[in-house]
């Protein structure tokens, strides 16, 4: 399958996986739409894509705010054309502490990681239904497969994305609209570079983007990578609770996100 000439819109495009996806899809011949909060970074990325002969448009929005998210995505689509591929990539992460019990951070993660996906799809889905074709994708995480100490809010938000996309995929099966859930492992991005522990099978953002685009071309329903970490977490998901608790005891001492509020 070729993406040449198709319109692809990516949220959270100002850094990390979103930035790399935009460059990769532009190289594939897509007209690329960029949505994120940071205008300066979006302008830099748009300039880079245009320098290499690509077609690009961008708009700023806080993806956790419904009106902003829908308006920005539809504004970009109005300039580039009907959306063929929407990638809901925007996401945030923070530790879930118990002393104090940081409910505001959990709320923020659910607003961005879950509702941000819903709002993004809301902006593109009606147009796809009217045209009778399209592709919706969401970036989840391998962390969604197991509740991890210190990550309760993050892992729960990503698990919610998985279930939401699964149900939507079945609903849209007869509408000729593909739905893909992407679950990466550790990827070198601004969100993970603060981690104080060794990240197994760490990938660059460019490598992750290449793998994701390949999965989207194949219209994979769910794509988990790298396979080694995926296998480990899936085994942990079905392992006895007493064994998992023992395995995770050391992990519990070092939460994966910096202890700063979102």
Positions of predicted regions on the chain:
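Conserved glycine-rich Rossmann-like NAD(P)H-binding loop of the short-chain dehydrogenase/reductase
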Residues: 30-45
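Conserved glycine-rich cofactor-binding loop
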Residues: 7, 14-15
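Active-site helix of classical SDR
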Residues: 121, 157
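The beta1-alpha1 cofactor-binding region of Rossmann-like NAD(H)/NADP(H)-dependent oxidoreductases
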Residues: 39, 60-71, 103
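Residue(s) in the substrate-gating loop at a strand-loop-helix junction
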Residues: 141
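C-terminal helical subdomain
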Residues: 181, 197-232
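Substrate-binding pocket helix/loop in short-chain dehydrogenase/reductase
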Residues: 97-110
């Amino acid at each position: 399958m070729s993406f040449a000439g198709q319109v692809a819109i990516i949220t959270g495009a100002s850094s990390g996986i979103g930035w790399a996806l935009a460059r990769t899809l532009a190289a594939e011949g897509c007209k690329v739409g960029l949505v994120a909060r940071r205008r300066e970074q979006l302008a830099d990325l748009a300039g880079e894509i245009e320098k290499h002969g690509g077609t690009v448009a961008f708009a700023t929005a806080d993806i956790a705010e419904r009106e902003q998210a829908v308006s920005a995505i539809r504004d970009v689509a109005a300039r580039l054309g009907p959306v063929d591929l929407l990638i809901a990539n925007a996401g945030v992460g923070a530790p879930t502490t118990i002393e104090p019990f940081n409910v505001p951070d959990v709320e923020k993660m659910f607003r961005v990681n879950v509702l941000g996906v819903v709002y993004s799809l809301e902006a593109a889905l009606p147009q796809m239904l009217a045209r009778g074709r399209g592709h919706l994708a969401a970036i989840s995480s391998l962390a969604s497969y197991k509740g991890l100490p210190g990550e309760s809010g993050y892992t729960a938000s990503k698990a919610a994305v998985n279930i939401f996309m699964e149900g939507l995929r079945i609903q849209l099966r007869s509408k000729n609209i593909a739905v893909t859930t992407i679950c990466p492992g550790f990827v070198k991005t601004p969100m993970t570079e603060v981690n104080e522990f060794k990240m197994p099978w760490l990938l660059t953002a460019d490598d992750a983007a290449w793998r994701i685009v390949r999965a989207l071309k194949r219209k994979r329903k769910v794509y988990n990578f790298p396979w080694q970490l995926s296998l480990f977490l899936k085994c942990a998901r079905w392992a006895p609770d007493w064994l998992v608790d023992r395995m995770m005891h050391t992990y519990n001492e070092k939460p994966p996100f910096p202890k700063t509020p979102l």
